[in-house]
Amino acid sequence: MIDKVYCADVTPEMEGKKVKLAGWVYRKREVGKKVFIVLRDSSGIVQVVFSKDLNEEAYREAKKVGIESSVIIEGTVKADPRAPTGAEVQGEKLQIIQNVDFFPITKDASDEFLLDVRHLHLRSPKVAAIMKVKGTLMQAAREWLLQDGWYEVFPPILVTGAVEGGATLFKLKYFDRYAYLSQSAQLYLEAAIFGLEKVWSLTPSFRAEKSRTRRHLTEFWHLELEAAWMDLWDIMKVEEELVSYMVQRTLELRKKEIELYRKDDIKTLKNAVPPFPRISYDEAIDILQSKGVNIEWGEDMGADEERVLTEEFESPFFVYGYPKHIKAFYMKEDPEDPRKVLAADMLAPEGYGEIIGGSQREDDYDKLVQRILEEGMKPEDYEWYLDLRKYGSVPHSGFGLGLERLVAWVLKLDHVRWATLFPRTPSRLYP
């Protein structure tokens, strides 16, 4: 019986071995009495050569087959340093599962067209590489979280109130009332810490923002952590240790995929080792002003400001101590400066900016009610959340990591939309 193998398993050491391959025709060319097919599967590619002199029937089938046709091939491995993988297969049998006459994606296809046919674009090896890196980053996150004693929980997606501001909520009819798509699992994770202490979740989050920047999606994957008994400095240490492990482990396991995008430019990834640099918001404003950026103390930093700031660093770094009025209601006021909150963002270098937003949470009932009122919201809409401050409240902190933003930085992508399977933006809901 002939062993079925993956394309990447065909190596020079298998010289003379009979193999069976199943995959899709990635490239094809004809030279004289030979047809060269580059076969693709989830593992990679391998070249298969069909010779008229060796097997005329298989050669005729190979001549018929089109790009992206699905096929099963049998043949014998032959070492060849000219082949893409150092070995090729001498084709002896080709079974066409489905022949494709014309594949719509061409080399010069525009980005918008590729997004229109995203269901077909996903089969590209470069797109598959992104998804492998993304999956490995989460595999690494799970490894670290498990060994550090965190519990995974599964919060709801349908919610009744806002976490990050009511203007960015997606509203939907829920029987005889209205519900919203979750902006963040944070409030539910805060409830879970009273039984589990250190919790995390990975869920889709939804933001009805009409932002058209390279780092915004209306639906993204959100890795969120929340822990009892931790202050801001404790949670920043968790953030840098987690991100460092995710990046270094992925470098170890997905070097080939990362090099497709970064070539040998991996210095900033290797630099992602704790402790990450830390600067205050005040220092960040001073740096920006010294570089000619028109920004005043108290203003929020957008993508442009963050891009300039990242030029100062060759690794991820923290900005902490933000003004209270530009941050969310649940963040704890700085006891040493009531103008500020105990919050910190982690920014990625090379212009990528914020990948994590975190803070110590307000654990005092009266102060939290006051902040809710200051934001023009109703305390009764947050009754259950306020209950957490009435029954054994403790100091606690947490953060959220935008997975697509992390992937975009790791692979130097020009937009986060390439880091998700089917991107959702203000102008795109298909396919």
From Swiss-Prot:
The gene is asnS. Pfam families: tRNA-synt_2, tRNA_anti-codon. The keyword Chloroplast does not apply. Its main location: cytoplasm. Transmembrane segments: none annotated. NCBIfam families: asnS, PRK03932.1, PRK05159.1. One of its GO terms (biological process) is asparaginyl-tRNA aminoacylation. It comes from the Archaea. It comes from Thermococcus kodakarensis (strain ATCC BAA-918 / JCM 12380 / KOD1). The keyword Nucleus does not apply. GO terms for cellular component: cytoplasm. It is found in: Cytoplasm. This is Asparagine--tRNA ligase.
